[in-house]
């Protein structure tokens, strides 16, 4: 299966869980956060659950042992994933669901790429200027010397490029256009 097909499949399952959650979205969200943390701490459990040779009955048994922390709807949803032999995608589906839930609550994570590590005061200025978008729940500062200066902010599928590299690239493009104009008139 191609990567886009996997992404579509993951998104489809996540949207189903999102819509099924309805008025219980906050509760399901907390349970999904718990489950993801559990799988991160107990990696062996997820490896066991995602193994194709483990029977559906055994997977169901494991999920029912965790059931005291999960609502019936979430357990049933996970059982559908197991029945459809998509257990290896479970973590991706749950992460995508969290992304949809955050988007619904107007919460988002931002990544600030800069040529060097930013000071807290600089990060605060950037996050305050983006606060009109919603609640920023996580900020990551990634160092990339290739941007030369300035910064690039990514949130969701959006990008704000205030880097020196992109400015210089635009300047080069404008220069090329002007040279072509002059060449055409001569």
Swiss-Prot record:
Gene Ontology, cellular component aspect: plasma membrane; proton-transporting ATP synthase complex
UniProt protein name: ATP synthase subunit delta
Family membership noted in the UniProt record: Belongs to the ATPase delta chain family.
Cystines in this chain: none
Subcellular location: Cell membrane
Organism: Wolbachia pipientis wMel
GO MF terms held by the record: proton-transporting ATP synthase activity, rotational mechanism
Top-level lineage group: Bacteria
Keywords from the named record: ATP synthesis, Cell membrane, CF(1), Hydrogen ion transport, Ion transport, Membrane, Transport
Protein topology in the membrane: Peripheral membrane protein
Keyword Transcription regulation found: no
Role played: F(1)F(0) ATP synthase produces ATP from ADP in the presence of a proton or sodium gradient. F-type ATPases consist of two structural domains, F(1) containing the extramembraneous catalytic core and F(0) containing the membrane proton channel, linked together by a central stalk and a peripheral stalk. During catalysis, ATP synthesis in the catalytic domain of F(1) is coupled via a rotary mechanism of the central stalk subunits to proton translocation. This protein is part of the stalk that links CF(0) to CF(1). It either transmits conformational changes from CF(0) to CF(1) or is implicated in proton conduction.
InterPro entries: ATP_synth_OSCP/delta_N_sf (IPR026015), ATPase_OSCP/d_CS (IPR020781), ATPase_OSCP/dsu (IPR000711)
Pfam families: OSCP
Underlying gene: atpH
Subunit structure: F-type ATPases have 2 components, F(1) - the catalytic core - and F(0) - the membrane proton channel. F(1) has five subunits: alpha(3), beta(3), gamma(1), delta(1), epsilon(1). F(0) has three main subunits: a(1), b(2) and c(10-14). The alpha and beta chains form an alternating ring which encloses part of the gamma chain. F(1) is attached to F(0) by a central stalk formed by the gamma and epsilon chains, while a peripheral stalk is formed by the delta and b chains.
């Amino acid at each position: 299966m191609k990567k886009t097909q996997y992404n579509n499949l993951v998104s489809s399952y996540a949207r189903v869980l999102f819509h099924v959650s309805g008025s219980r979205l906050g509760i399901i969200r907390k349970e999904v956060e718990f489950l993801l943390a559990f799988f991160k701490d107990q990696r062996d459990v997820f490896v066991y659950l995602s193994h194709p040779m483990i029977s559906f009955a055994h997977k169901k048994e494991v999920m029912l042992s965790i059931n005291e922390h999960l609502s019936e709807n979430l357990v049933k949803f996970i059982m559908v994933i197991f029945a459809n032999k998509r257990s290896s995608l479970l973590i991706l589906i749950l992460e995508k669901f969290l992304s949809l839930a955050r988007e619904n609550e107007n919460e988002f994570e931002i990544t600030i790429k800069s040529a060097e590590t930013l000071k807290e005061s600089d990060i605060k200025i950037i996050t305050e200027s983006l606060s009109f978008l919603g609640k920023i729940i996580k900020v990551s500062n990634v160092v990339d010397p290739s941007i030369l200066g300035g910064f690039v902010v990514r949130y969701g599928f959006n990008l704000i490029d205030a880097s020196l590299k992109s400015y210089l690239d635009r300047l080069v493009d404008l220069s090329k256009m002007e040279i072509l104009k002059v060449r055409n008139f001569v």
